[in-house]
Regions:
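Fe(II)/2-oxoglutarate oxygenase catalytic core
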Residues: 1-147, 155-190
């Protein structure tokens, strides 16, 4: 993410009226979504992104998908979810999860039209807050300007370790593809 966009996004953290607790979405068997604040699962703040800035971000995300993901996964872009600007205060965390599926009644069920997850790190001035992929034995210390993209599926369960000092700022978005990535996921993973 260009520094100019990062600076514009960081200004949003000053508008306390546009901050809310991020929620967890649960989708039932009928496809109905419910949003729940489950602080034991996720302690994250959500910052409202104005429409104009959101549109710029979506163009940038589409370009990054074309540049970095199409050559690796060979899947055409179908749709995206608007970017979310998240803040993790001291103690902020997110338990193990994947971004598209849930295990319910003995089977995996798709709950979101997400195939590629994008994470963009907007600052480095915090402790803790590492991104971990437990099944892959991989832990990443985020740094300002870093982008991480990975399949949104159950094979890529991940979590965010609690922030120990400072405030971790992240931009997240998800892309849906015309063809599912299940058969195109590289053996080397992320």
């Amino acid at each position: 993410v260009p520094d100019k966009h990062i600076e514009e996004l960081m200004l949003l953290t000053n508008n306390k009226e546009q901050i809310s607790q991020a929620t967890v979405i649960n989708r039932d068997e009928k496809g109905e979504d419910s949003h729940q604040e489950k602080l034991e699962n996720r302690n994250t703040l959500w910052y409202h992104i104005p429409e104009e800035e959101g549109n710029k971000l979506q163009v940038a995300i589409s370009q990054m998908y074309a540049r970095f993901c199409v050559p690796k996964y060979h899947c055409e872009f179908k749709n995206y979810e608007p970017a979310q600007f998240l803040g993790y205060p001291v103690g902020g965390h997110y338990i193990e999860h994947n971004d598209a599926e849930t295990f319910d009644r003995g089977e995996w069920r798709r709950i979101a039209d997400r195939d590629v997850s994008f994470l963009f790190y907007l600052n480095s001035e915090f402790g803790g807050g590492e991104l971990e992929f437990p099944e892959l034995g991989l832990t990443i210390k985020p740094k300002k300007g870093m982008m991480i993209a990975f399949p949104s599926y159950k094979e890529y369960v991940h979590k965010v370790h609690p922030v120990t000092w400072g405030h971790r700022y992240t931009l997240v978005s998800w892309v849906g593809t015309k063809q599912k990535l299940y058969d195109t996921i590289p053996k080397e993973g992320v």
